[in-house]
Amino acid sequence: MPYVVVFYDVSDNKRRDLLAKTLQSLGLVRVQRSVFMGRGGYTKAKEAIRAASRIVDARTDSVVALVVPEDYARRMLVYGGIMSDPKQKQAVRVV
């Protein structure tokens, strides 16, 4: 199953917090401050964009949902901790 990566630039704190909570409610996991990731394909990506369109201001904000094939996601390189796992001690991780 592919993965969905959602990243955003939202200027208003209230809208940004609401978007983060909404993405979490869709089953996505925060990997950086403005980046969420989870299993799902094109349908999940569209769901995330639809939800974002009800929250953000398209004149000043942007939200991108990217569908990544599973074999590409497994080759992801990570330096530093993943925000959803702040106790992670590994500096470099190959998924």
From Swiss-Prot:
Mg(2+) binds at D9. GO terms for molecular function: metal ion binding; RNA endonuclease activity. It comes from Hyperthermus butylicus (strain DSM 5456 / JCM 9403 / PLM1-5). CRISPR (clustered regularly interspaced short palindromic repeat), is an adaptive immune system that provides protection against mobile genetic elements (viruses, transposable elements and conjugative plasmids). CRISPR clusters contain sequences complementary to antecedent mobile elements and target invading nucleic acids. CRISPR clusters are transcribed and processed into CRISPR RNA (crRNA). Functions as a ssRNA-specific endoribonuclease. Involved in the integration of spacer DNA into the CRISPR cassette. It is an enzyme of class 3 (hydrolase). InterPro entries: CRISPR_associated_Cas2 (IPR021127), Virulence_VapD/CRISPR_Cas2 (IPR019199). Belongs to the CRISPR-associated endoribonuclease Cas2 protein family. HAMAP family: Cas2. Homodimer, forms a heterotetramer with a Cas1 homodimer. Gene3D superfamilies: 3.30.70.240. Its EC number is 3.1.-.-. Its cofactor is Mg(2+). It comes from the Archaea. This is CRISPR-associated endoribonuclease Cas2. One of its GO terms (biological process) is defense response to virus. Keywords: Antiviral defense, Endonuclease, Hydrolase, Magnesium, Metal-binding, Nuclease.
